């Protein structure tokens, strides 16, 4: 009986760890009005490195992150103190095996306490990016281009817009608010280069 309980406990831990890891596989984008060149991003990840006292969301070159970025500790529900740091400052922490560009930008969230041995912390990053080169409207048509690196990627068009073309296979549906949502699955080891185009829906 004791062995059975131990086995069940180990199975539960394994399933929980797998579930947490699975959630690292997806990212969600919500396109705002193309005249703003802005879109929102949300993604989760788990931090396991013993002694790590902060987490980072790295901003791609060419994008500008809004100051209202939030990082939430999903295990406690609390918002972390966030601030913008340079790649040089991140590299000095020694948390990541591959150094980032010293001139790059990241949003840093400070954990309430460093990661303890055999513990982990799950966080959610929510940000608004501005990318005039990658998201714009021309002649009444919006264009959004981006490389997607996660296995599962969701992109939602602004309210009132319909999809006219997409260069990569996607599952297309409507969300609860009637907005067009695209689901991209990437089973390769490299990134998907996505180009989405859309137009405003004509009113009857």
Where are these regions (language model features)?
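Solvent-exposed beta-hairpin/edge-strand motifs
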Residues: 53-93, 145-169
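Surface-exposed, acidic/Ser/Thr-rich flexible loop segments
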Residues: 48, 52, 99-170
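Early extracytoplasmic/domain-onset interaction patches
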Residues: 17-59
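Short amphipathic beta-strand and strand-loop transition segments with alternating hydrophobic
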Residues: 26-33, 84-99, 110-115, 171
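Hydrophobic residues positioned within well-ordered beta-strands of beta-sheet architectures
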Residues: 25-27, 39-43, 107, 123-125, ...
């Amino acid at each position: 009986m004791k062995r059975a309980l131990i086995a069940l406990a180990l199975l539960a831990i394994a399933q929980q760890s797998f579930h947490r890891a699975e959630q690292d596989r997806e990212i969600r984008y919500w396109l705002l009005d193309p005249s703003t060149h802005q879109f929102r991003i949300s993604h989760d990840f788990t931090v396991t490195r013993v002694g790590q006292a902060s987490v980072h969301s790295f901003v791609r070159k060419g994008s500008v992150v809004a100051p209202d970025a939030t990082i939430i500790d999903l295990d406690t529900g609390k918002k972390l103190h966030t601030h913008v740091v340079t790649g040089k400052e991140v590299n000095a922490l020694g948390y990541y095996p591959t150094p980032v560009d010293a001139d790059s930008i990241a949003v840093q969230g400070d954990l309430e306490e460093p990661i303890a041995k055999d513990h982990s912390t799950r966080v959610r990053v929510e940000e608004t990016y501005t990318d005039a080169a990658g998201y714009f409207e021309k002649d009444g048509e919006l264009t959004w281009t981006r490389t997607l690196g996660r296995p599962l990627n969701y992109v939602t068009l602004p309210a009132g817009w319909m999809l006219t073309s997409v260069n990569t296979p996607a599952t297309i549906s409507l969300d609860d608010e009637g907005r067009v949502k695209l689901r991209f699955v990437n089973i390769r080891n490299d990134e998907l280069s996505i180009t989405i185009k859309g137009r405003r829906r004509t009113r009857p």
